[in-house]
């Protein structure tokens, strides 16, 4: 115990918001790395068709899970973060989740003909099991997250993903294919639920109709807004699976996952900020939320911009060597998706802010318009030009969503950007891009090792330039170092 205290005490000396941001950042980075490496292995071990079947399983799971959740997850995080009658609200949401299990059983039985493509993949039974386990995992995760245990929640998320990947790698190696992938997904949720429950402070307590009304008044709009977000995440996957081959699903989802490297800082910032912004709003401290927004955008672009530049310059070779020749054929789609992730920085933060500021209705309105347009464009473009049509549809409608969210959010708080910080990020990224471009002109990228060199060189050059140009980021690192104990 003493050794653990010695190890953790420097970290605990860091100011809480910084500490939670760092824990979230590093766990998200670790999750991203684990996800990328495992997907690379699966791409070579089982190919794009098996991966496509697994991605369809995930698409249906997340779609059905949203329906069965009904917005309860977001609502309970919101109500618990406000700090009023938290046990009663948690219990009310948990009981509703249990009741929805019965509804899920009935819906899946009647929906078997609709789920024909996933039935052919042999993972329909895994889907049913995953939905049941997901209810308990979501309850524990949302309970800890709403209680402000952001670092713990991220750690459990890491355990979920890491356990999932370890199980999947072993199962794929033993030849279980898509069943091993689906089984690993469920195993990860079980492991994270057990550990997260150990630290859950919330308890089952009698609730009344008032608590249900409080949850549903918020969950209804969260459900509708989440439905819109889900369209951006999985509608294209399901539509590609309907019009094209399962292999095309595998290629598209791998490309999409690869580009999400640009937004892991956005995910980290949003995860940390949501309960904070919710609390600031409840206490009338909107100025704190305004300052955090400008910082959130800057720190989100910190990675998104250089990843975009590097992806455009090296994307075709990275896809070829990391995943295989069939995935490299989607390079043009990959470039479009890189732009999508830049837009996603603003859309993600702005819609998160609308929900945290107790404006789920506004969040739904802006997302619903874009989501409807996304489905229409998917049906128009995917049958004609393939997976690049899905990427173009996502780019157009996500830009629309971001703009509409901006118009709604600026009526609530004052939106400011740190133009100096953004300028420094752009300058460092451009110079990095020139350096990487010169390397590619001079050195043929004939193998994976020659491809990794410009990636590492570009990263080092970018970090050096950014720390040289931006005193705020440099001072932030120095401050964290002092709080840890480095002088």
Regions found by a protein language model. Name each.
Residues 124, 156-202, 218, 256-259, ...:
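Hydrophobic alpha-helical transmembrane segments
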Residues 2-10, 437-487:
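Membrane-proximal transmembrane or re-entrant/amphipathic helices at the cytosolic face
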């Amino acid at each position: 115990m003493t050794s653990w205290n010695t190890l953790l005490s420097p970290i605990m000396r860091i100011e809480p918001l910084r500490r939670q941001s760092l824990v979230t950042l590093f766990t998200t980075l670790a999750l991203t790395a684990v996800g990328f490496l495992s997907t690379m292995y699966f791409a070579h071990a089982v190919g794009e068709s098996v991966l496509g079947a697994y991605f369809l399983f995930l698409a249906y799971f997340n779609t059905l899970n949203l329906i069965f959740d009904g917005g309860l997850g977001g609502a309970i995080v919101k109500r618990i973060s406000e700090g009023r009658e938290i046990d009663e609200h948690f219990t009310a949401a948990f009981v509703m989740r249990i009741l929805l299990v019965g509804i899920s059983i009935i819906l899946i039985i009647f929906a078997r003909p609709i789920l024909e493509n996933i039935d052919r993949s042999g993972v329909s039974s895994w889907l049913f099991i995953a939905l049941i386990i997901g209810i308990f995992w979501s309850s524990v995760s949302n309970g800890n997250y709403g209680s402000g245990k952001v670092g713990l929640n991220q750690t459990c998320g890491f355990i979920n993903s890491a356990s999932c990947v370890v199980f999947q790698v072993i199962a794929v190696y033993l030849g279980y294919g898509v069943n091993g992938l689906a089984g690993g997904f469920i195993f990860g949720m079980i492991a994270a639920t057990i550990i997260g429950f150990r630290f859950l402070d919330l308890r089952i307590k009698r609730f009344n109709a008032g608590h249900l009304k409080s949850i549903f008044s918020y969950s209804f709009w969260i459900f509708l807004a989440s439905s819109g977000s889900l369209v951006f995440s999985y509608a294209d996957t399901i539509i590609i699976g309907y019009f094209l081959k399962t292999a095309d699903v595998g290629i598209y989802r791998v490309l999409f996952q690869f580009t999400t490297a640009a937004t892991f800082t956005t995910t980290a910032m949003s995860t940390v900020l949501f309960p904070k912004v919710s609390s600031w709003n409840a206490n009338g401290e909107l100025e704190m939320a305004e300052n955090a927004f400008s910082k959130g955008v800057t720190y989100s672009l910190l990675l998104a911009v250089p990843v975009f530049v590097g992806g455009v310059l090296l994307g075709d070779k990275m896809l070829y060597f990391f995943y295989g020749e069939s995935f490299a054929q989607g390079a043009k789609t990959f470039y479009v998706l890189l732009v999508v992730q830049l837009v996603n920085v603003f859309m993600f933060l702005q819609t998160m802010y609308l929900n945290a500021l107790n404006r789920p209705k506004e969040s739904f309105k802006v997302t619903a318009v874009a989501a409807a347009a996304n489905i229409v464009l998917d049906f128009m473009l995917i049958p004609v030009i393939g997976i690049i049509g899905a990427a173009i549809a996502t780019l157009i409608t996500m830009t629309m969503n971001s703009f509409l969210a901006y118009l709604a959010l600026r009526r609530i708080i004052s939106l400011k950007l740190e133009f100096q910080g953004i300028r420094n990020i752009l300058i460092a990224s451009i110079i990095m891009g020139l350096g990487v471009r010169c390397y590619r002109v001079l050195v043929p990228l004939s193998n994976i090792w020659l491809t990794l060199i410009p990636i590492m060189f570009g990263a080092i050059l970018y970090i050096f330039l950014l720390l040289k140009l931006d005193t705020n980021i440099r001072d932030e690192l120095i401050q964290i170092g002092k709080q840890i104990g480095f002088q």
